[in-house]
Swiss-Prot record:
Subcellular location: Cytoplasm
Source organism, top-level taxon: Bacteria
Organism: Brucella abortus (strain 2308)
Disordered: region residues: 1-23
Pathway: Nitrogen metabolism; urea degradation; CO(2) and NH(3) from urea (urease route): step 1/1
Name of the protein this chain belongs to: Urease subunit beta 2
Predominant localisation class: cytoplasm
Catalysed reactions, semicolon-separated: urea + 2 H2O + H(+) = hydrogencarbonate + 2 NH4(+)
Gene Ontology molecular-function annotations: urease activity
Upper lineage: Bacteria, Pseudomonadati, Pseudomonadota, Alphaproteobacteria, Hyphomicrobiales
Pfam families to which the protein is assigned, alphabetical: Urease_beta
Amino acid sequence: MAKEPTEAAHPQPEQTKTNHKAHRPVGGYVLAKDPIEINQGRPRTTLTVRNTGDRPIQIGSHFHFFEVNRYLEFDRSKAFGLRLDIPANTAVRFEPGDEKEVTLVPFAGKRFIFGFNNLVDGWSGDGPTPDYQPNREIAAERAEKLGFKSCKSGGKDAK
């Protein structure tokens, strides 16, 4: 008859103690003890947006909000040069018929915007527009001509 294995015959490895305060996910960085506020000090604009289409629409964090799906109805002129005030790699989803408020912040850097729906393809900053760059009015006319919905209500500047 075989003998039962004993603890002495099969020693267990010593348990390692984990310092949970220093723990971080693989590849992650701990930048500060306190939460980090995104877009700190940037002006914010709040708009009411309604999905008039029959399909869900999802908008990513760094999409030029002026150029989002043509079936989203909001004051597009107030969204010129702005993006969602949400963490990178996240999105806001609008189901058909949904109406919700979104908060927008200006793009940083030189504020040149290209691609998306090709409504701007140039500088999106405030102030005088260089002659060779499209301006807010031209982009708004282009959006209207291409059937992008807009309304003049539902926007406010947040402090």
